[in-house]
């Protein structure tokens, strides 16, 4: 637990990427009209949840007026509305909503992280920004020692989780799994990797991701966690 606390402290003080620093601080200063009475977080957003979790949910990056405003991943935006509703439905959260850091939300046997910790312009981090954030992702993966199931939200998170594992010296399967919604693969180190479309407005408004599809992902995660842990044998 102390490892994650120290990691998250370092994350919140990171200034490695000048483009992201400028953007996150500009958004925090200018604000969106509906949030003009908020004091925006305007810094990198750390991971959040149960340090002893068996489920790890990995997203892309904080939203400019979501996590960059509230200081908590997936909090205060429509993507979070979908995610926390699903987590609550399957027993991974104590409530279905996430509005601000002090709203009483607790994750149960679940931890949420991101491939990039600062809100990027147009929701598109640059390749060098992914690389700059990779050490944080690797350290988060190392620190979450009880993880059995990983749900990646979107192709980018799926691919970068595998890259981080490779960088950690873990032997990736061959052929390498390719992202698709609902893909389930047991990796050589006995972690179950599940791919899901990201619950972004673009995906949910167009129907690419529906509520039943989202719920099925976390029903699968819950089912996998109910199975015996082969690593204990």
Model-predicted regions and their roles:
Residues 1-177, 181-229:
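A polyanion-binding, active-site-adjacent surface
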